[in-house]
Amino acid sequence: MMSRCSFLILLGCLFLTCCTKDGDTIYQPDSDEPKASTAPLVTVIYGKDALGDRSYNDLIYKGIEEAVAKYGLRSMQMSPTSYEEGLAYLQTMFQTVSATKADTIRRLYIVCAAGYDEYIRQNAHLFAENPNADLLYLETPDPLPEGCGSTLYMPYYGVMYEAGAIIPAFLFNECLLLVANPEDETVNLAAKGFTDGFLTDYYQPKYDWGDILEKHLETRYLEDKSGDGYNIADSTAFNLLSELSEVYFFGYIVPLCGGSGNKIRYLCDITMTGNGCMGIDVVVPTEVVSVLKHIDRAVGLCIGQWLSPEGMPKHQVLGLKEGYTEVALNLNEGYTTMYNTYIPENLRQQIHEDAIRKEEAYGK
């Protein structure tokens, strides 16, 4: 009797742990097996070939991962290799938003990709139908419709105006603006800011022999379409710099073109062309002037707001006045003398205040 009971118990256990139906094995759940995470998920979609630019987009990546570690979140960051691949990512994003209306997992989608504005605005209404999905659309001055997501704009006009006003003090009078394309508002407003600051005569720098510095400024676009021009090939960058060096020897290059600008600046350093090249988004130790955009801090701020009971504001502007952009100087003894001679403290303050005022005027 005892052996029969033991047999029945063993048989029952076998049925519970490894019964088969149509050849498929059904396993008893393992209590030690990790369960799928229900932590909030942050998904980031970049522009074409954006990551690896060692400036703006890499700063976004850094800010996202710091926030993920701080708040115990999950992240998925996607950098497409073509416009079409980026569009496919966005299509998947909107499909997921529609398909997860009953899901309790919170999801934040961050889009920092120029060139998809019309498509994003046409479909953003889907976020209004999903209480647990939110959209943060970066670098647009125009808010989304109510309930369809949040927008963040970090204008570069003010800080570029300030940098443009400072540059002549270091006897950089031949300036070339390299702009990614003529359609993306962010880089073109930055170019406008630099132009306005550079051409404003706050002071009159002179050469050692007494002649007044004459200013010359030219703008050149790398590509024609929105979203393009931010990551040109190495060979293209080399040929471009070779061409520019024949015309702008000892000139100053202001690269408003993402990763393309980093390639140009690196080539300036190793080829000894004599060209200066402004640092953009991050501090470049080899350059006199760098213009910083603290986008890593900004996305961290937005994620913290998203997790808060109040949520993210509908639209935020974080620029020079708010301390999210700034000019960083790296001056040796000679440059320090020039700076103090032409731009004393009271004039520095005036330039800074003018830059803030003009940036705010462009935001209205």
What annotation goes with each model-predicted range?
Residues 301-364:
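Hinge/cleft segment of the Venus flytrap/periplasmic-binding protein
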Residues 64, 159-216, 314-341:
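An alpha-beta-alpha
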Residues 128-154, 283-285:
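Flexible loop/hinge segments that line or gate small-molecule binding clefts
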Residues 75-97, 220-243:
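Structural motif
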Residues 151-175, 291-313:
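Hydrophobic alpha-helical segments within soluble ligand-binding/sensing domains
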Residues 42-63, 67, 76-90, 187:
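Extracytoplasmic "Venus flytrap"
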Residues 15-18:
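C-terminal motif of bacterial Sec signal peptides marking the signal peptidase cleavage site
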Residues 44, 100-115, 134-138, 247-258, ...:
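Periplasmic-binding protein-like
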